[in-house]
């Protein structure tokens, strides 16, 4: 995935399924300069990780 698509997903009112390493995640934010997104595991929203947007996959 790229930064542009992550930003589109963040601004969308629709639910768009995204995975990171096969795990469903919610995208919380995206840093356009570094290409890093903050994501939460859907099943464990208490923990967030910062990942490169290229590691995210839209399902």
UniProtKB/Swiss-Prot annotation:
GO terms for biological process: asexual sporulation; sporulation resulting in formation of a cellular spore. The gene is sspH. Its main location: other. It holds the Pfam family SspH. It comes from the Bacteria. Induction: Expressed only in the forespore compartment of sporulating cells. It comes from Bacillus thuringiensis subsp. konkukian (strain 97-27). The lineage of its organism: Bacteria, Bacillati, Bacillota, Bacilli, Bacillales. Belongs to the SspH family. Keywords: Sporulation. It is found in: Spore core. This is Small, acid-soluble spore protein H. One of its GO terms (cellular component) is endospore-forming forespore. The keyword rRNA-binding does not apply.
